[in-house]
Regions:
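Ribonuclease/tRNase effector modules and their secretory precursors
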Residues: 1-91
Length: 91
């Protein structure tokens, strides 16, 4: 099933400036069949964190919220840290 994915343009610019990762490129992580996803309980809203591969083969960490079962708003994306890469590769 195709997800509807959105992000705020200003937030996407800040994310690229800070992490050098485009939110538009990070969408592919959500379609990675072996991605690792956990709930992030550190926030008021229910957030999810997924470690997976983007379209260029780079391992990314993507944070997002569900607006409904098929509608996602991306919050941030960054390159995986070494320990996150090991976690992903061991999955």
């Amino acid at each position: 099933m195709k997800l509807r994915i959105q992000f705020n343009a200003a937030k996407a610019t800040r994310n690229f400036t800070k992490h050098r990762v485009r939110l538009a490129d990070a969408e592919a992580v959500l379609y990675d069949p072996i991605a690792l996803t956990v709930e992030d309980n550190d926030h008021d809203e229910q957030r999810w964190v997924t470690i997976g591969v983007d379209g260029s083969g780079q391992i990314l960490v993507v944070v997002y919220v569900y607006r409904d079962p098929n509608f996602i708003r991306l919050i941030s994306a960054r390159k995986a840290q070494p320990q996150e890469t090991i976690q992903y590769q061991g999955a």
